[in-house]
Curated annotation (Swiss-Prot):
Assigned GO CC terms: cell outer membrane
Function, as annotated: Murein-degrading enzyme. May play a role in recycling of muropeptides during cell elongation and/or cell division.
Top-level taxonomy: Bacteria, Pseudomonadati, Pseudomonadota, Gammaproteobacteria, Enterobacterales
Matches recorded under CDD domains: LT_MltC_MltE
A biological process term (GO) from this entry: cell wall macromolecule catabolic process
UniProt keyword terms in alphabetical order: Cell outer membrane, Cell wall biogenesis/degradation, Lipoprotein, Lyase, Membrane, Palmitate, Signal
Gene it is expressed from: mltC
Key word Glycoprotein present: no
Enzyme Commission designation: 4.2.2.n1
Family that this chain belongs to: Belongs to the transglycosylase Slt family.
Residues lipid-modified (S-diacylglycerol cysteine): C17
Catalytic activity reported: Exolytic cleavage of the (1->4)-beta-glycosidic linkage between N-acetylmuramic acid (MurNAc) and N-acetylglucosamine (GlcNAc) residues in peptidoglycan, from either the reducing or the non-reducing ends of the peptidoglycan chains, with concomitant formation of a 1,6-anhydrobond in the MurNAc residue
Record's bilayer topology term: Lipid-anchor
Protein name: Membrane-bound lytic murein transglycosylase C
Length: 360
């Protein structure tokens, strides 16, 4: 719950640009759930980061980007899970090497619990974990994986001696160090969640390869994934749409909480349950399983209604039209005629990723 308390306090927190004091403050989750409120807060967050870091230097957490600010927003760690890079930067005028060293160590040794780290404040709440999330995804200059603090500290010292860079953006001098993840970092992260994926697959009758493909496309297996649409976690579940539908189908009232969806097992379960709903309820009128899979994939991104409207404004007629088409033609139609460019690309990405998981 700590994360969402800070989210509700972003505006005053950033105006003062100081560490937050959360004691004695009440958290109104219902207010934070409001999408407009979330958008306003994110806009304020971005504006204040720009004031501190300078124009074109705004960097925020996203589906495939972990971004954590510390030191009164003067130091940040960025993991780009798509590119496979860790970039640690600071604009601190005093002891920039020390700030970078601490950020490198904490980033390399952080755990995998998104509820334990506040991405929306400068609170240094990153706990050193006995099972670091990045263990096996990054190696030091000797080729060894990094689990212990002494090894992370030694590697940080090496990086400061050999890879420290600086640039002047006209407002600040930015000191940075970039670390590459191992080439198969994506597979390393996917492996962490295979047990959860298999359990959800058996529970809901959804192919493991499809679940993994959705996770790769949505978050690149980043458990800290957030988005401008307030989608959360590995499968980027939105509380008030997919989350609400799944809870209702399971006889639960209300919406899944943010902390619930940031738990990897819950997120995978909810996302997979929604895939099953799309397949067995919303798009059940599509007979061919391959055509229905294409529709389900596209609907996971843009909704079942938008998929059917590509073919007809009448849902029954849309299903009949799809049933009269070959699967390849359905794929071609969805990737060329869907009104959302994102949804058109989404089907291509997920379908391509699913093929790779079927071969493994």
């Amino acid at each position: 719950m700590k994360k969402y308390l800070a989210l509700a306090l972003i505006a005053p927190l950033l105006v003062s640009c100081s560490s937050s004091n959360k004691k004695g403050t009440e958290y109104n989750e219902a207010w934070v759930k409001d999408t407009n409120g979330f958008d306003i807060l994110m806009g304020q967050f971005a504006h204040n980061i720009e004031n501190i870091w300078g124009y074109n230097e705004v960097l925020l957490a996203g589906p495939k980007d972990y971004v954590k600010y510390t030191d009164q927003y003067q130091t940040r760690s960025h993991i780009n899970f798509d590119a496979g890079t860790i970039t640690v930067e600071t604009i601190a005028g005093t002891d920039p090497r020390g700030r970078l060293r601490q950020a490198i160590i904490k980033t390399l040794l952080m755990g995998d619990d998104p509820n334990s780290i506040d991405l929306y404040s400068d609170v240094d709440d990153i706990q050193i974990s006995k099972e670091p999330f990045l263990y096996g995804q990054v190696v030091d200059n000797t080729g060894a994986s990094i689990r212990w603090e002494w090894r992370a500290a030694r590697y940080a010292d090496y990086l400061l001696q050999t890879r420290l860079k600086s640039r002047n953006n006209g407002l600040r001098v930015i000191y940075s160090i970039t670390i590459n993840l191992v080439p198969n970092h994506l597979d390393k992260r996917a492996h962490k969640y295979l047990g959860m994926v298999r359990q959800a697959s058996r529970k809901y009758g959804v192919d493991e390869s499809l679940i993994l493909a959705i996770m790769q496309t949505e978050s690149s297996f980043n458990p800290y994934a957030v988005s401008h649409a307030d989608a959360m976690g590995l499968m980027q579940v939105v509380q008030h749409s997919a989350g609400k539908d799944v809870f209702r189908s399971q006889g639960k009232s209300g919406l899944p909480s943010r902390s619930y969806l940031f738990d990897p097992a819950n997120n995978i379960d909810t996302g997979t349950a929604y895939l099953a709903m799309l397949n067995n309820v919303y798009l059940a009128g599509i007979d061919n399983p391959t055509s229905r899979r294409y529709a389900v994939i596209t609907a996971y991104n843009g909704g079942a209604g938008s998929v059917l409207r590509v073919f007809s404004s009448d849902k029954v007629q849309a299903a009949n039209i799809i049933n009269s088409m070959a699967p390849g033609d359905v794929y071609q139609t969805l990737t060329t005629r869907h009104p959302s460019a994102e949804s058109r690309r989404y089907l291509y990405k997920v379908n391509t990723a699913q093929k790779s998981y079927r071969r493994k």
